[in-house]
Design a protein with these regions (language model features):
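N-terminal domain-start segments of secreted/luminal proteins
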Residues: 18-56, 60-65, 69-72, 85-91, ...
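Short, small-residue-rich packing micro-motifs
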Residues: 55-64, 73-122, 163-165
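Long, low-complexity intrinsically disordered regions
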Residues: 114-136
Length: 235
């Protein structure tokens, strides 16, 4: 009886962040779902997200807004796993671990990356990305090969900048700090390719930026042109 009471007390003291809602589906078009343990939960705008969830799309797209202002955009036939999310600014605690395991996922930094960047791990099957408060997109193929591209970041006032990321495997690391600079990784045992600037036509820039122009990321067409101009200045 005393042992049972001890177990119950220990369970009551488990961090609530393990089961708390850490964000929600802010936009969805077409079919998508949330894998939660052994359950598959149909998703839509307003669906709550928990740590250890996996967001999956088939012929749809999804955007998730986290409570620390981190945002991820997930395109068709993609999967994003939320391995860990802890955000407690009152106690100066924050950590985030995500894995893009298939398809195309765009990541935009929130408060955790800005305040606790050492506690942020963004992964693909073949690479780990170190984040220093910026946006980037990951494209992951069926065997885990990954293309990581750094993107310009713009606020709702139209102010744009390019941050910096590191892309690392067991065999090496590269640093990227120019908009539309990209590197590829085939396996975790091979080094990333040297970063190169992508020479992109206008429609491909639109695709890589994953159409945030209809969300608060960029308010109007003029601000949208500013964002693309920053990228094209480097290509």
């Amino acid at each position: 009886m005393q042992f049972a009471r001890y177990i119950l007390t220990a369970l009551l003291w488990l961090p609530i962040t393990a089961y708390a809602n850490i964000g929600q589906v802010a936009d969805q078009k077409g079919n998508g779902a949330i894998e939660r343990g052994r359950d598959l939960v149909g998703s839509g705008v307003g669906t709550e997200i928990q740590s250890m969830d996996a967001a999956v799309t088939t012929n749809g797209t999804m955007r998730i807004d986290f409570i620390d202002d981190t945002r991820v955009d997930i395109t068709q036939h993609s999967k994003l796993i939320i391995d860990e999310f802890v955000f407690d600014p009152a106690n100066d605690i924050g950590s985030l671990s995500l894995k893009a395991s298939l398809g195309t996922v765009r990541y935009a930094s929130g408060q955790i990356a800005k305040k606790y960047k050492q506690n942020v791990k963004i992964r693909t099957p073949s690479a780990t990305i170190g984040v220093r408060g910026t946006d980037f997109v990951m494209v992951v193929d069926e065997v885990g090969g990954s293309l990581i591209t750094l993107l310009p970041s713009c606020d709702s006032a139209g102010n744009c900048y390019t941050g910096e990321i590191t892309v690392e495997t067991d065999a090496g690391m590269v640093i990227m700090n120019q908009a539309f600079q990209a590197t590829a990784t085939q396996t975790s045992s091979q080094p990333p390719t040297p970063p190169r600037l992508l020479d992109l036509p206008e429609d491909m820039i639109d695709a890589l930026l994953i159409v945030r122009k209809k969300t608060p990321w960029v308010e109007d067409e003029e601000e949208w042109k500013k964002a693309k101009k920053i990228g094209r200045a480097h290509v």
